[in-house]
């Protein structure tokens, strides 16, 4: 009986394996990538290292994807592949068919075997079929007991898209010559902490490995990239949630890289609700966070002041944006984010394709500014899809408004005309200035609604200027510290009020 577990997607890519001798200074090794429901497996595959970026590309040896030359043997495939039933989708061109030859059949007491894969045709373009693969089914039709002629007829009747379920049958292919084993290659060298990359840099040189390696897809980071020597975005960077394992892969072209990135991210996304539930339980157990709900979680790529980038795990609650270097899996780790941005003092100032004033070259980027007692913190992030950008944009804007509606009022000590005072800003009642002399009664010195505020500004050091018009004109308040936090909160209150009015209009 067939298992309900979906057959993994497999294909050949190239893994950055270390320093090379060419102009690009990098060595690449062909590997078999296998994507299952919750794990990504990388196995060493046959074949010489691929060309470095910018170098002329040589004709690929026929045995990389099948024995297309007479007498050539199939690749020495990794043990991981020998144990797998794989489902491969082949999309046929208008001419040329599947581009395979088959042998075997019930009359020969053998399964239906792929004996030849023709270079450049549909099967070869999948990079996931191999000479020696047994075809178990075609579009769901069982071929396990088919004769050779029956299999030929089934394959001939297929449409433009053909789903083949296959399994590599090394033991029943004695007439195929084994090719020599591939060189060893590595992937699991821990990156520097925090995870940082120079612009378009693939990360540290990995250690060698000679057998399959497995990376959990639980909250893994997936990013499409290019390199200084090859501007085509056909590279993938994949990091484990704990930041200890990093893969830097090269696909044959941009379309292939995009397809793999989409498929891997889709599997990561299916695991995200479970991660969110686990973090929600940890968050509820912390004494400082209370019972805040997690509104959004995901990896962002942050532009660093040095010019590099870093994977940053962002966790958005009802009140804060918490940024981590890796997935927090304990209460202690969750309570110690690398940075925290209170939403009420945070503004989304850019979302979408970068502009000339924004020093970031990503098409899908957004910028946040947070008012603090030390000034304004600015952070630039990018995401991998328009859907992610839309989700983060909406959640951040809505989060700012929720925080404003939840807080309602803030107060700060200040000095006005030499008198010690207290400034209260309420989302509905507006601005109230109270006398705060020691021993004196708490008297209202000034009260103005938001509707009267014509302009606000600050000097970036300690002074806040509020212009309500009328007889008072502009008032000057000395907050005795950087006024940016209160300025950003005033803007959040105003934005929330405008949104509230828009919803009621």
Curated annotation (Swiss-Prot):
Q: Which GO terms describe its cellular component?
A: anchoring junction; cytoplasm; cytoskeleton; dystrophin-associated glycoprotein complex; neuromuscular junction; plasma membrane; protein-containing complex; sarcolemma
Membrane topology according to the record: Peripheral membrane protein
Q: Which Pfam families match?
A: PDZ, PH, PH_17, Syntrophin_4th
Q: What is known about its processing and modification? A: Phosphorylated by CaM-kinase II. Phosphorylation may inhibit the interaction with DMD.
Which tissues carry this protein? High expression in skeletal muscle and heart. Low expression in brain, pancreas, liver, kidney and lung. Not detected in placenta.
Q: Where does the UniProt entry say this protein principally localizes?
A: membrane
Which compartment or compartments is the protein found in?
A: Cell membrane, Sarcolemma; Cell junction; Cytoplasm, Cytoskeleton
Which parts of the sequence belong to the SU domain?
449-505
Q: Can you cite a GO biological process for this protein?
A: ventricular cardiac muscle cell action potential
In this chain the PDZ domain maps to 87-170
Sorted keywords for this record are: Actin-binding, Calcium, Calmodulin-binding, Cell junction, Cell membrane, Cytoplasm, Cytoskeleton, Disease variant, Long QT syndrome, Membrane, Phosphoprotein, Repeat
Post-translational modification Phosphoserine, affected residues: 101, 184, 189, 193, 200
- Annotated region (Calmodulin-binding) at 483-505
Q: Which PROSITE patterns match?
A: PDZ (PS50106), PH_DOMAIN (PS50003)
- Which residues does the annotated region (Disordered) include? 1-25, 40-77, 180-210
**Key word Repressor present in the record?**
no
Q: Where is the PH domain?
A: 6-269, 293-401
Segments forming a coiled coil: none
Family membership noted in the UniProt record: Belongs to the syntrophin family.
What the protein does comes down to:
Adapter protein that binds to and probably organizes the subcellular localization of a variety of membrane proteins. May link various receptors to the actin cytoskeleton and the extracellular matrix via the dystrophin glycoprotein complex. Plays an important role in synapse formation and in the organization of UTRN and acetylcholine receptors at the neuromuscular synapse. Binds to phosphatidylinositol 4,5-bisphosphate.
Q: Please name the PANTHER family in this protein's record.
A: ALPHA-1-SYNTROPHIN (PTHR10554:SF6), SYNTROPHIN (PTHR10554)
Q: What is known of its domains?
A: The PH 1 domain mediates the oligomerization in a calcium dependent manner, and the association with the phosphatidylinositol 4,5-bisphosphate.
Disorder cited: Long QT syndrome 12: A heart disorder characterized by a prolonged QT interval on the ECG and polymorphic ventricular arrhythmias. They cause syncope and sudden death in response to exercise or emotional stress, and can present with a sentinel event of sudden cardiac death in infancy.
The protein's name in its UniProt record:
Alpha-1-syntrophin
Source organism of this protein record: Homo sapiens (Human)
